[in-house]
Structure formats: C-alpha cells, structure tokens
A protein has these predicted regions:
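Tandem repeat scaffolds
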Residues: 1-121
Length: 121
C-alpha cells in the first residue's frame, strides 16, 4: 500500500500497489500531491490535474503527461527522459535541474503555454 500525501489539506490517497511505476493516474485530481522520491517511470498522467504537485528527486522516465494540468508544479531534480508532456498546460513551474538527457521537453514532445519558468537544465 502506498500513501500519497497532499499539501495543506492533510488528506491522503491510498493506492493498493507496491510501486507507482507504470501506474495509471489518468483523469485523477492530484492537486497538491506530494510525489517526491517515488519511481514514476512509465506512469500515465493523461488529463490529470497536477496543479501545485511536487515531483522532486523523482524518476519519471517514459511517463505520459499528455494534456495534464501542471500549473505551478515543482519538478526539481527529476529525470523526465522519454516523457511525453505534449499539450500539457504549464504556467509558473520550477524545472530547476531537470535531467532530460539533452532532449528538449519544451519543444517537440514538450510543454505548451509555458511562461514564467525558471530553467536550469
């Protein structure tokens, strides 16, 4: 059982699994979820509400964030290699020290509607 905490609300989401790798979060409301340190490789976040989510020090290789709402997400020091962020909505995120192995997550399969972002890749 994995227990995901949410900022400010003191709420939790319990997932009956031993790993989040490959987990399908599509369409879920994960506003303010703390996903720091989990392995999210291959996870699906299609049309997921990820506003103010924290994904720090996390592997998200080959994860799918297609059409996800990523406004004000904190994505520091995470590995997004091979992840699909196409058509995701992102305003005000912090991408400090994201490891994308030289691939551009902003163009191509990157984020759309990007502004006010601090890049340090």
């Amino acid at each position: 059982m994995i227990r995901i905490a949410f900022l400010i609300t003191n709420k939790f989401l319990e997932i009956d699994s031993t790993t989040l790798a490959g987990y399908d979060f599509s369409g879920m409301n994960l506003h303010r979820a703390i996903l720091n340190g989990y392995c999210l490789d291959g996870a699906k976040f299609e049309k997921t509400h990820l506003r103010n989510v924290m994904i720090q020090h996390t592997s998200t290789r080959n994860a799918v964030f297609h059409n996800a709402a990523l406004m004000n997400a904190i994505l520091n020091n995470s590995d997004f290699t091979g992840s699909d962020c196409s058509n995701s909505r992102s305003i005000g995120e912090n991408f400090k020290a994201i490891d994308n192995h030289g691939k551009d997550i902003i163009n191509g399969k990157g984020l759309s509607n990007v502004c006010k972002i601090h890049y340090n890749v």
